[in-house]
From Swiss-Prot:
The keyword Amino-acid biosynthesis does not apply. One of the primary rRNA binding proteins, it binds directly to 16S rRNA where it nucleates assembly of the body of the 30S subunit. Part of the 30S ribosomal subunit. Contacts protein S5. The interaction surface between S4 and S5 is involved in control of translational fidelity. Residues 104-166 form the S4 RNA-binding domain. GO terms for molecular function: rRNA binding; structural constituent of ribosome. This is Small ribosomal subunit protein uS4. It comes from Methanococcus maripaludis (strain DSM 14266 / JCM 13030 / NBRC 101832 / S2 / LL). It comes from the Archaea. Belongs to the universal ribosomal protein uS4 family. One of its GO terms (cellular component) is small ribosomal subunit. Keywords: Ribonucleoprotein, Ribosomal protein, RNA-binding, rRNA-binding.
Length: 178
């Protein structure tokens, strides 16, 4: 059957490991979005870096193929609501930051919708299989939510969290009302 191919890394590590300012910034972002380790942040940064690299390449490409690729890039970024402008330009893509991608993670959206009290609890609910997107259980906190899926996030029907009087659920809704 042959050897399975070796998959490449999906992230790039920082060039220098001990820059205090970068470490502090990463720590704040990790706490705000409930990331477990820096690798999750680096994956999102690499994804953003790839979008920006593609935009820089397309700025210099004035052919019709370059125009088609720019439209495709805009469609992907609009599908995930990373780019929210009506008439996007490549400059809008270049001005994106890491928080625009982190806001579209399932973990962040579950917390923002009030299905969990904290980002860490949102992560726990997702990993334990209590959250469904379009009726399908999703156990990946880093799953990027498209605009179409935004309103279809709910508790799994056979989960104990689906009950209105579950202790964790009532605590989350009572804090939301205050």
């Amino acid at each position: 059957m042959g050897d399975p191919r070796r998959l490449g890394k999906k992230y790039d590590t920082p060039n220098h490991p001990w820059i205090g300012e970068r470490i502090q910034k990463e720590k704040e972002i990790s706490q705000k979005y409930g990331l477990v380790n820096k690798k999750e942040l680096w994956k999102m940064e690499t994804q953003l870096r790839n979008y920006r690299r593609q935009a820089r390449k397309l700025i210099s490409d004035t052919t019709t193929q370059g125009g088609k690729e720019a439209v495709q890039l805009f469609n992907v970024l609009k599908r995930y609501a990373i780019l929210i402008e009506e008439e996007p330009t490549l400059d809008h893509v270049l001005s994106l930051n890491i928080e625009s991608i982190l806001e579209r993670r399932l973990q962040t959206i579950v917390f923002r919708k009030g299905l969990a009290k904290t980002p860490k609890q949102a992560r726990q609910f997702i990993v334990h299989g209590h959250i469904a997107v379009n009726g399908k259980r999703v156990t990946a906190p880093a799953y990027l939510i498209s605009v179409a899926e935004n309103d279809a996030i709910e508790y799994v029907s056979n989960s104990p969290m689906a009950s209105e009087n579950h202790p964790e659920r009532t605590a989350a809704t009572s804090e939301e009302n205050q």
